[in-house]
Design a protein with these regions (language model features):
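Rhodanese-like catalytic fold shared by cysteine-dependent sulfurtransferases
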Residues: 1-92, 96-183
């Protein structure tokens, strides 16, 4: 990530998460996108009322990296690597899925901090101990990772593949409850 940026990928629920994470529709936005994705990003922002795009970084993140400027890196592991870590250390696991997703099934001992509430619950993220972050598939947890990096957190790891990958491991999980019964 570029320092002090929020990483909201075009490949997921882009408009929804822009709306959740950038509450001020007049906020100036400078885009860092893949080459030839600038127009798509501007159009998608505009469709949901974000008309204050002030420009984009030509060449995207690659141009930033090639310029020698600082950037943030997030450690990432898959579910099987988390399983090994879990057997040895029982890490703090923070699940950024919606409460209903968490209530449906989660890793035993995980803490739920939904992504859309992250800024109100930063105190739940330890600064003095490493932790593991995940969502359902990896999209939302990377948004969370960019926000945490922006706010000074460094010692955490993201689970690539999210709970979908974790669910294939022997990590203890709560009993599955159909989400429709939780309404």
């Amino acid at each position: 990530f570029i320092p002090n940026s929020i990483n909201i990928g075009l490949d997921g629920s882009f408009a929804q998460w822009v709306g959740e994470m950038i509450p001020d529709i007049k906020q100036e936005i400078l885009l860092v996108t893949y080459e030839d994705k600038e127009k798509e990003a501007i159009t998608r922002l505009s469709r949901v009322g974000y008309d204050n795009t002030v420009g984009f970084l030509k060449g995207g993140f690659d141009a930033w990296e090639k310029s020698g400027k600082d950037f943030e890196v997030t450690n990432r592991i898959d579910g099987s690597e988390l399983e090994t870590l879990y057997k040895n250390k029982k890490p703090i696991i923070i699940d950024v899925r919606k409460k209903s997703e968490f209530d449906s099934e989660h890793a035993i001992g995980a803490i739920n901090v939904p992504l859309n509430e992250i800024n109100q619950h930063l105190a739940q993220f330890p600064k003095d101990k490493p932790f593991v972050l995940h969502c359902a598939g990896g999209y939302r947890s990377m948004i969370a990772a960019s926000i945490l990096k922006q706010r000074g957190w460094q010692d955490f790891t993201d689970v690539r593949g999210g709970f979908e990958d974790i669910s294939k491991t022997s990590i203890p999980k709560s009993e599955y409850v159909c989400p429709s019964t939780l309404l």
